[in-house]
């Protein structure tokens, strides 16, 4: 028996767990329905930073990307879903063992993302200092 995640579920949990992005000036979070799941995005054009919450039946990941010399530098990709994990069965469009399992997973994603953004900001400061731009 699996729980079929709805768009309302996805929006509600993304809004709750990723509110810290809005507090940091990120806009967006418009949820887009795709054949294989849902996609939500946050961005800060002034920093060139985009965060994607991408959910499909096989994989869920959060990606932080920013432009660097005309290319996108992938700062971090977090694979938050093991296909072999029995709590998260494949089955199309976000089938989960329960809504609680999805909420737990996204809460972990948000925590990891906060940590990675903090680390990335620290790395930027070190880069600026090392390059004499500080």
How should each PLM-predicted stretch be described?
Residues 1-17, 28-134:
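Intrinsically disordered, low-complexity regulatory regions enriched in serine/threonine/proline
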């Amino acid at each position: 028996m699996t729980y079929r995640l709805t768009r309302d579920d996805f929006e509600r949990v993304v809004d709750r767990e990723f509110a810290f992005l809005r507090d940091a000036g990120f806009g967006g979070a418009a949820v887009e329905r795709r054949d294989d799941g849902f996609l939500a995005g946050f961005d800060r054009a002034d920093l060139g930073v985009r965060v994607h919450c991408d959910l499909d039946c096989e994989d869920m990941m959060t990606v932080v990307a920013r432009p660097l010399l005309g290319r996108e530098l992938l700062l971090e990709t977090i694979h938050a879903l093991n296909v072999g994990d029995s709590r998260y069965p494949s089955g199309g469009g976000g089938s989960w063992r329960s809504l609680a399992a999805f909420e737990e997973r996204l809460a972990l994603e948000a925590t990891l993302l906060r940590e990675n953004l903090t680390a990335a900001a620290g790395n930027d400061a070190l880069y600026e200092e090392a390059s004499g731009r500080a």
